[in-house]
Design a protein with these regions (language model features):
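Short acidic/glycine-enriched loop/turn segments that link adjacent beta-strands
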Residues: 65-67
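Short, low-complexity Ser/Thr-rich regulatory SLiMs
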Residues: 62-63, 76
């Protein structure tokens, strides 16, 4: 397991970015972060809902030049 990871899901439509992020979070240690890069505008709403439902913390959500960047912390941090 790693302390942090980046997942590039640019070009994919929802729900694929959230599904792939959920799978990627299993590969990072509890308390570690996953940065997700997406281009689907619906991803902002989807990642907020995903965070609420799963308990993974959405640390930030930003957009720059059409790329959405989400930073999630895997639940279970010490």
């Amino acid at each position: 397991m790693t302390d942090s990871a980046t997942l590039d899901v640019q070009g994919l439509s929802c729900p694929l970015p959230v599904l792939k992020a959920n799978k990627a979070l299993r590969g990072v240690a509890p308390g570690a972060t996953l940065t997700v890069l997406a281009t689907d505008p619906a991803a902002a709403k989807d990642f907020a809902a995903f965070s609420e439902e799963t308990g993974h913390e959405l640390l930030s959500s930003t957009a720059e030049a059409g790329v959405l960047r989400f930073v999630l912390r895997r639940r279970g941090a010490p």
